[in-house]
């Protein structure tokens, strides 16, 4: 196409515009239209992204305000609005908030369903999916919702997820609740000695160990 335009330019300078236009005119017009549509389409898409992002931001903030006022159910309904769910970043945020709000109103079934959806979503950031996987397991263990939860907790502990340390702490606490203090002490000791574990968690489990002495 570049050679075509160069040839047209040279021929025009030689006063052969009329003949060339009859030959190449339709291609020049077509190329110009493609360029205009491409640039205009990108600009339109870019502006739409900005507009959609602004709408999502307003709707998301409004949902948080409703939650802060105590209307958690209304906040969940607002987070389900289309203008939030169609914007990638806000879609993930709204799902996370919906799960947390469902927990606040004791709708554990809805919370678990949302945690699972987040964890299995192809387009969400890995860190968000790992958080959701942890919450999906932790809630089931804490609320004793199903018998498979403990096995899933052990599986999570065996991974390289950054949440494995909290999962291990939960396991130790459940051991205490079932009267198995020896197993709890072993787990807490492992966490306290693990240099990869978060410092605050290591301090916390050290306090648990003092209590269990």
Predicted regions mapped to residue ranges:
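N-terminal positive-inside, membrane-proximal cytosolic segments immediately preceding the first
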Residues: 1-34
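Short extracytoplasmic
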Residues: 58-93
């Amino acid at each position: 196409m570049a050679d075509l335009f160069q040839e047209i330019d040279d021929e025009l300078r030689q006063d052969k515009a009329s003949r060339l236009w009859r030959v190449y005119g339709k291609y020049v017009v077509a190329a110009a239209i493609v360029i205009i549509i491409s640039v205009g389409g990108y600009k339109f898409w870019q502006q739409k992204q900005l507009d959609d992002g602004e709408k999502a931001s307003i709707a998301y903030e409004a949902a948080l305000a409703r939650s802060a006022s105590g209307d958690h159910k209304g906040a969940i309904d607002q987070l389900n609005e289309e203008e939030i769910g169609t914007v990638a970043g806000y879609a993930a945020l709204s799902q996370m908030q919906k799960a947390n709000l469902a927990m606040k109103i004791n709708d554990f079934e809805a919370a678990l369903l949302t945690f699972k959806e987040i964890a299995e979503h192809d387009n969400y950031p890995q860190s968000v999916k790992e958080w959701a996987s942890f919450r999906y397991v932790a809630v089931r263990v804490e609320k004793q919702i199903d018998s498979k939860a403990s096995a899933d907790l052990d599986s999570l502990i065996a991974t390289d997820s950054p949440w494995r340390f909290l999962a291990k702490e939960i396991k130790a606490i459940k051991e205490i609740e079932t009267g198995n203090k020896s197993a709890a002490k072993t787990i807490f000791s492992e966490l306290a000695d693990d240099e990869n574990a978060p410092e605050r968690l290591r301090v916390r489990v050290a306090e648990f160990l003092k209590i269990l002495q």
